[in-house]
């Protein structure tokens, strides 16, 4: 589906004002019969930014209120984020009850209802988009575009029931990324030999095989970062990657960079003026 609008905006002004719906009713018909979510964070420096902690606390409250089964995992001390993600993926696949893996990096901030929306969408791989540090107008995810009859490039995707958009992605960022179990299983089927052994990653299981879902790699004289590699290989395995743009996100370093990708694509002059972070659980 091609999403069109004036001045390459993907939504009407009315749709652009729509915020993610708070899915507080666990009996909604779109909810799967069984869901176990693993929320995982690689901590290199053994610390998380305070906005990350605040957002996570509210997510825990919301998922608990909804009766969604979940666990929080952290992996500390690995200086290679791609290796940390692969270690988490391996452990995730060893839990037969786990259905969804949600990576959230320790320098993120988000509104909790958006995370819940992403969990219960049917697509296999969905990422949020957040501002690049030091440049709020640049974003970490790259949508797919196609040329319309008007000669302009338009993002590809579909309109969700709440009036917001879900965009097909060329690249999804790893710092706020939901992956369904079936996506990792299909990756392993497509690339059965793309694994390594790392005894130091888990001394209690020194023979475990770690698939390279994430890695930095040079191909065709291009350097692929770990999330670019993941996105590329998922598409080559026949899977689609998607962006859920309507998340109020912050990306923190020496200071915070905040924005809403939905507002950015809808033509907002400065997405830092998007609605305040909704961290209140009703």
Predicted regions and their residues:
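Conserved catalytic core of nucleotide-sugar-dependent glycosyltransferases
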Residues: 89, 111-215
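Active-site nucleotide-sugar/metal-binding loop of Leloir-type enzymes
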Residues: 86-100
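Conserved donor sugar-nucleotide recognition element shared by glycan-biosynthetic enzymes
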Residues: 81-85, 227
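Residue-level signal for alpha-helix termini/capping positions
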Residues: 31, 93-94, 119
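N-proximal low-complexity "stem/linker" segments adjacent to membrane-targeting elements
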Residues: 1-79
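Short, Asp-centered acidic motifs that coordinate Mg2+ and/or phosphate
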Residues: 100, 124-125, 241
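Short beta-strand-to-loop acidic/aromatic patch adjacent to the donor-nucleotide binding site
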Residues: 97-109
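C-terminal catalytic/acceptor-binding lobe
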Residues: 2-24, 29-35, 190-282
């Amino acid at each position: 589906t091609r999403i069109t609008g004036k001045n390459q905006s993907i939504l009407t002004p009315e749709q652009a004002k729509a915020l993610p719906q708070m899915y507080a009713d666990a009996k909604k018909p779109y909810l799967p019969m069984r869901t176990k979510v693993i929320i995982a964070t690689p901590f290199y420096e053994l610390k998380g930014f305070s906005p990350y902690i605040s957002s996570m606390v509210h997510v825990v409250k919301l998922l608990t209120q909804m009766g969604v089964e979940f666990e929080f995992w952290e992996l500390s001390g690995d200086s290679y984020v791609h290796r940390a993600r692969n270690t988490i993926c391996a452990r995730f696949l060893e839990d037969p009850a786990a259905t969804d893996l949600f990576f959230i990096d320790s320098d993120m901030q988000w509104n909790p209802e958006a995370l819940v929306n992403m969990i219960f969408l049917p697509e296999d791989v969905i990422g949020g988009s957040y501002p690049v540090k030091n440049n709020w107008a640049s974003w970490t995810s790259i949508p797919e575009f196609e040329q319309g009859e008007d000669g302009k490039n338009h993002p590809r995707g579909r309109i969700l029931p709440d009036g917001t958009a879900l965009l097909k992605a060329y690249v999804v960022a790893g710092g706020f990324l939901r992956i369904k179990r079936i996506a990792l299983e299909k990756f392993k089927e497509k690339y059965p030999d793309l694994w390594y052994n790392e005894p130091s990653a888990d001394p209690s299981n020194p023979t475990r095989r770690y698939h390279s879902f994430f890695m930095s790699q040079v191909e065709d004289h291009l350097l692929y970062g770990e999330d670019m590699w993941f996105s590329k290989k998922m598409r080559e395995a026949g899977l689609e990657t998607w962006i859920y743009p309507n998340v109020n996100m912050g990306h923190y370093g020496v200071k915070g960079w905040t924005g809403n990708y939905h507002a950015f694509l809808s033509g907002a002059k400065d997405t830092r003026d998007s609605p305040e972070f909704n961290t209140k659980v009703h």
